[in-house]
Amino acid sequence: MASLRQIAFYGKGGIGKSTTSQNTLAALAEMGQKILIVGCDPKADSTRLILHAKAQDTILSLAASAGSVEDLELEDVMKVGYQDIRCVESGGPEPGVGCAGRGVITSINFLEENGAYENIDYVSYDVLGDVVCGGFAMPIRENKAQEIYIVMSGEMMAMYAANNISKGILKYANSGGVRLGGLICNERQTDKELELAEALAKKLGTQLIYFVPRDNVVQHAELRRMTVLEYAPDSKQADHYRKLAAKVHNNGGKGIIPTPISMDELEDMLMEHGIIKAVDESIIGKTAAELAAS
């Protein structure tokens, strides 16, 4: 068996990270790759399209019911779904209580100790990425995830999050083997989106792995808790995910240490592409009425 590829999908909340990752992994499984998904998002939605489920029972919730994580067996937490993809959700505490990253740490240790990573080609971590706090950075910090793919769009906050995630990768790149595999742009149909995605990739020293076009078939599939690959395998969108999967598959060992930019540089990039205008300092703090009167 080829060496295990440990990849991770990061991205800001609501960007379509889990949808993009599950469709990409379904396409990799179509190619004959054996996949394990480890959901590291408290929403526990990283496997729903593979399992046709609302949300998979998480390791933390199952451990709480059983008494402790030591009381669990691998078959208690792992489910097998579309294309024989193995699925696990780490889970997290109730909102406002404790560190959500704790589930990530507990889960990865449990899975490793119980042989979950045997006889597979890819482990994929699906990680919340608005903030790269200690817990959510666990797959990076502990040298678990070797290739990071950031799902983003042409929206400013999605690019801001991508840059922040790159800072997290840079922090741990020298002490471990983690590298940025590239950006995946999940189209939101904003102005000059492809240009901006390519420009940000260049600034970060990486590549735009794929530009995933927006298509309503994705939502139709999601409503049925299915990937596009399963719901509409002959669709153009399914082929886009297959092309994305092929790009990821052929990208092994090609990751880079990113070169994150400052907020000012990000705003300058948006100005260069005509997305925002140069800020007139004289209008800062002025109300609409005050501006109209001036």
From Swiss-Prot:
Cofactor note: Binds 1 [4Fe-4S] cluster per dimer.
Name of the featured protein: Nitrogenase iron protein
Protein residues bound to ATP: 11-18
HAMAP family cross-referenced by the UniProt entry: NifH (MF_00533)
Any one of the GO BP annotations: nitrogen fixation
Cofactor annotation: [4Fe-4S] cluster
Family: Belongs to the NifH/BchL/ChlL family.
Organism: Bradyrhizobium diazoefficiens (strain JCM 10833 / BCRC 13528 / IAM 13628 / NBRC 14792 / USDA 110)
